[in-house]
Each structure stands twice: as C-alpha cells, then as structure tokens.
Regions:
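Positively charged n-region of N-terminal signal peptides that target proteins for export
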Residues: 1-4, 10
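C-terminal motif of bacterial Sec signal peptides marking the signal peptidase cleavage site
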Residues: 19-20
Length: 229
C-alpha cells in the first residue's frame, strides 16, 4: 500500500514538472491517463481526472484542441455571489413568515364569522392575505433556488481548483488570486468491442498565489469526460 502511494505521489510530482515545461500538455496527460485505464490503475486515474471514467480501450486519438483561455480566478466572485444569495434568502424569511401569520389570522376570522356580511369581509381578507403570502412565498422559493445554485457553483469551482493544486483542502482557497488556464480537448476512443466513442475533456490549470504572493504548484487536470453526441 505504501509503495502504491509513493508511486501515485511520484506521478503527481512528475506531472507538475513536465507540465510546467510544456505549452501543449494535453497529449502527455491523456496518454498517461489511458495507460492507467489499460492497467486498471484507479489511483492514477483518480489523481488525473476529477471525475474519472474507464473503458476497455483498444486505441484513442485526439480530434481537436481548443485555443487555451487564460482568465482571472472566478472563485472569489462565486463566493461573494453565494454570500449575497444567502443574505437575500435569509432576508426573505421574515416577510414570508409575517405574511403566513396574517393569512392564518384571516382564516381564523373567517371561521368565526357568522353573518353573511362578516363572512364576505372575512373572505376578502383571506383572499388578500393569500395573494400576499403567495407573492412572498414565491420570492422565498426563488431566493432559495438562487442560493442553492450559487452555493453549488462555488463549491464545484473550489473542488476543481483544489484538484489542480493537488490538495484535498486549503482554508484560504476562496481568497486566493491568480489565473485559470482552460482548454477543451475532443478525443475518439475505440473500445475493444470496436465501438468508437467521442468525448469532450474540459481541462484546467489554476495558477494561484498565496497571501505572501508566492505561486502555488499548479498542474493541468481533466475535469470530466463529456460524451459528444
């Protein structure tokens, strides 16, 4: 087990060194990945792809490589969007509960109404309170959905960044600055059964700096394998 761990760590270290010296790392990375697939080396596959996949591969080839993009790290912005969405959701709790209280009180009054006139007035109050509650509840659902989506987006980006850095966790990851390199690679995979399958491989590398301004070791990684229809 210790030997297997040392081998995986060696592969990770080698990938850092090789990728830093190569402007077109995708062929080497993908070649090493498919070698691991053929050897059924799950540990190596899991060290190279955030969402690894496996087939009975006879051969493979690269169909296309998109131009490399270099963009600022988005995680700080996604973290702020998550915080803003949570604030909006939490701020809507009070108005929704207040509207519900008014609605329940109106329904109680309606239950106690006896005369036709009192019932008509009570029904109008219930209808108005129901409309108000429906409006506030719809806002609550929207804010909750927005927060759920924002939280998921920030978490997903955090996991990709950590994976590129070769780390399981880093307390300050959401506060780091730097650039994200990305490209899409399309590959054709021929299985041992003769089937040819096409996949798009989003690839990323995060070049980030810590609080002291020092660059953190970065490597290209495969995010996932997306079937090309």
């Amino acid at each position: 087990m210790r030997k297997r761990t040392l081998i995986v760590l060696g592969i990770l270290l080698a990938s850092f060194v090789i990728q830093s010296c190569s402007s077109s790392p995708e062929r080497g990375i993908i070649s090493r990945y498919f070698n691991a697939v053929r050897m059924n080396d799950n540990a190596t596959m899991a060290s190279m792809a955030l969402e690894p996949a496996q087939w009975d591969v006879a051969s493979w080839d690269i169909v296309s490589v998109s131009p490399e993009k270099i963009e600022p790290m988005t995680l700080p912005g996604l973290t702020k969007a998550e915080a803003d969405a949570k604030k909006a959701q939490d701020g809507q709790i009070g108005p929704t509960m207040d509207a519900d209280t008014v609605l329940q009180n109106a329904k109680d009054e309606q239950d106690l109404a006896r005369s036709a006139g009192a019932k008509a007035v009570a029904k109008k109050k219930v209808d108005e309170a129901q409309a108000k509650y429906d409006t506030e509840y719809a806002k609550m659902k929207e804010f909750k959905t927005n927060y759920t989506n924002a939280k998921a987006a920030a978490s997903a980006e955090e996991q990709i960044a950590l994976f590129s850095l070769g780390l399981r966790e880093l307390a300050s990851i959401r506060d780091l600055s730097g650039n994200v390199h990305s490209k899409d690679v399309v590959v054709n995979i021929k299985t041992t059964q003769g089937q040819v399958k096409s996949y798009r491989l989003p690839m990323r590398m995060y070049e980030l700096k810590n609080d002291a301004g020092q660059k953190l070791p970065a490597r290209w990684i495969i995010v996932k394998f997306e079937p090309v229809v």
